[in-house]
Regions:
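Conserved catalytic-core segments centered on acid/base and nucleophilic motifs
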Residues: 135, 200, 295-297, 376, ...
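Preference for short coil/turn "hinge" residues that link or interrupt alpha-helices
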Residues: 113-115, 193, 265, 355-358, ...
Length: 459
């Protein structure tokens, strides 16, 4: 939802006046806009409108005015502005990562959002730790959100496995775990709001035909039905088939966007669908499920997420979520993305691994041949080694390919740095054989537990 012109001008006026006063009444509109966006980062998506509003303010409020006039005007429109500006100056933050755009000490809230298809693996460690380390740097909140709104792809033990993995990654500091299947009524509420406002519609078109129409940038007939008809269709989605409701696959709810958008993925994308597959945490009557794009958008704003840190493969998702939130008039978080990391030579598919475990190829999720976090924990790897790996890569937009050998060389080096001063020296000889050595006198040998810490005693 784009802010009204007068509302926008009122919001940015104190910042433009302050900027003009700082430069003796002279204003560079683009520089002034930069000052505005620095303090109001939520307006970045409307930068063109902000620049136009700055130009209007310069013409109506600043041109021809003395610095004293500008100071008087600033006191008139925002008496406490200077004090608020000083109070809002961000405390310098130090940590293993570069400062995060738009983040404030004590106000940052980030999340990770795995699906319960299996435990976490190496691929999850980077993103999870990046988010967690930023939360620690800024004294903010870190949320684990389990996204389980696809009943067809749920491995029931994964709920506990994931929580256990994240507790290990965060040294037990995760206290807020949200499960999306427990929030369905919230998603339904906002789904109905979009129907009632005419911003979405229930589409019963054949999926193949609809894809052809989308490719041609043509709207289907469902789009133009009256709101009352859309409401009837929405209600019918919740009715069991035996009572006259839709069958699975009959309809989907779509957001009304630009059907001619240059990016086909942005054209009237789906928000809800019917899935009658049994869900381990929902009642048997539950059949309407939000697609990830809908539930994620709603949760990110309602849970107070300030920054969504994700891979570049989620760029379109961020744009879609922004459209949903703007139509609902809800706060939009800041989206930042890291480059794709291709872990070359890693078998990370949880579905394939699950089958292999069931067939006895692996002993379990902590089989030492796997790349799960449970395996790494069992092998003695320290969380700090993976934190150092995440910090070394950082929130970089560049794509990377990391080979099996390259990854382990880096992680093993980091792990050794951590373990080296902690590990006592022991030795072990399997199936020892006693031998006699001639020509040597007998004497006792005593070796320290650790050569650098003799106070630990001897072996």
């Amino acid at each position: 939802m784009i802010m009204a012109e007068n509302e926008l001008k009122s919001k940015i006026l104190p910042f433009v006046l302050h900027n003009a006063i700082s430069f003796s009444g002279k204003v560079n509109p683009k520089a002034s806009m930069g000052f505005v966006l620095k303090h109001l980062p939520e307006l970045r998506k409307d930068a063109k409108l902000v620049l136009a509003a700055v130009g209007g303010i310069v013409e109506s409020e600043i041109s021809g005015k003395s610095v004293d006039d500008l100071k008087a005007r600033l006191v008139e429109v925002a008496p406490d502005f200077e004090a608020q500006l000083n109070a809002s100056k961000k405390e310098e933050v130090k940590g293993p990562l570069k400062p995060l755009r738009g983040a404030e000490k004590g106000k940052l809230c980030v999340r990770i959002a795995p699906s319960p298809s299996g435990p976490l693996h190496i691929g999850h460690a980077y993103g999870s730790l990046l988010n967690f380390m930023y939360a620690q740097m800024y004294g903010g909140e870190f949320i684990l959100r389990i996204e389980d709104t696809n009943p067809s792809n749920i491995y029931s033990p994964a709920y506990d496995l994931i929580l256990d993995d994240v507790k290990w990654l965060t040294n037990g500091k995760v206290v807020n775990c949200v499960v999306q299947s427990e929030r369905l009524e919230t998603y339904y509420k906002y789904g109905r709001d979009l129907i009632d406002s005419g911003d979405s519609y229930v589409c019963d078109c054949d999926s193949d035909n609809w894809r052809e129409m989308k490719a041609k940038k043509a709207a289907c007939s469902c789009r133009d039905l009256e709101i009352v008809d859309q409401q009837t269709r929405w209600d019918k989605m919740f009715i069991p088939v035996v009572d006259g409701g839709y069958s699975e696959g009959d309809v989907v709810v779509r957001l009304k966007t630009d059907i001619a958008h240059k990016n086909p993925a942005m054209r009237d994308f789906s928000l809800f669908r019917i899935n009658d597959h049994a869900h381990p945490k929902a009642s048997g009557a539950t059949r309407v499920w939000p697609l990830m794009i809908m539930s994620v958008a709603i949760d990110d704003t309602l849970l107070g997420i300030t920054h969504v840190l994700n891979g570049k493969d989620h760029l379109d998702n961020g744009r879609k979520e922004t459209l949903i939130l703007e139509k609902l008039g809800l706060r939009v978080p800041l989206y930042q993305h890291w480059g794709r990391i291709n872990f070359e030579g890693f078998a990370l598919s949880t579905s394939k691994t699950r089958i292999a475990i069931e067939q006895g190829e692996y002993t379990g999720w902590d089989d030492i041949r796997l790349a799960t976090l449970r395996t790494l924990r069992r092998r003695g790897y320290q969380v700090g080694a993976f934190s150092k790996f995440a910090a070394a890569i950082g929130l970089s937009p560049n794509d990377k390919t990391v080979s099996w050998d390259e990854f382990w060389k880096m992680v093993n080096s980091f792990n050794k740095e951590i373990v080296e001063p902690l590990a006592n020296r022991y030795f072990f000889v399997e199936d020892p054989v006693e031998i006699n050595v001639e020509g040597m006198s007998s004497h006792d040998v005593s070796l320290a537990m650790h050569p650098d810490f003799v106070d630990r005693g001897n072996r």
